[in-house]
């Protein structure tokens, strides 16, 4: 299994319950599609380097997990994160061992 890290930026004006539901939903997408050893946590609310969708800051969330390279977890997360309006940006990185 390969270790991956996902960083995504959540819009700053989301309420706490909606943010918790969003994080739970996307963590579920990863685990339901073959990811293991998921560790998910909020990083912090930070000022953005440039404006994204009229927002000047965002809530950074980071998730680390292990998955097979052929796993659907990465492609499904990427597909749904692009559609979701609460996620401003996301990045998936393969962690070197």
From Swiss-Prot:
SUPFAM superfamilies registered for this protein in UniProt: Ribosomal protein S6 (SSF54995)
Top-level division of the source organism's lineage: Bacteria
Gene Ontology molecular function: small ribosomal subunit rRNA binding; structural constituent of ribosome
Pfam families for this protein: Ribosomal_S6
Gene3D superfamilies, alphabetized: 3.30.70.60
Stored InterPro entries: Ribosomal_bS6 (IPR000529), Ribosomal_bS6_sf (IPR035980), Ribosomal_S6_plastid/chlpt (IPR020814), Transl_elong_EF1B/ribsomal_bS6 (IPR014717)
Record keywords, A-Z: Ribonucleoprotein, Ribosomal protein, RNA-binding, rRNA-binding
GO cellular component, one term: ribosome
Membership in a protein family: Belongs to the bacterial ribosomal protein bS6 family.
Protein name: Small ribosomal subunit protein bS6
Organism: Lactococcus lactis subsp. lactis (strain IL1403) (Streptococcus lactis)
Lineage, opening ranks: Bacteria, Bacillati, Bacillota, Bacilli, Lactobacillales
């Amino acid at each position: 299994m390969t270790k991956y890290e996902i960083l995504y930026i959540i819009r700053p004006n989301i309420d706490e319950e909606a943010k918790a539901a969003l994080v739970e939903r996307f963590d579920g997408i990863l685990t339901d599609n073959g990811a293991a050893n998921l560790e998910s946590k909020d990083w912090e609310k930070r000022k953005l380097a440039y404006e994204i969708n009229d927002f000047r800051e965002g809530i950074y969330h980071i998730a680390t997990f292990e998955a097979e390279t052929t796993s659907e977890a990465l492609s499904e997360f990427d597909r749904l994160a692009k559609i979701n309006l609460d996620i401003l940006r996301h990045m998936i990185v393969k962690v070197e061992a």
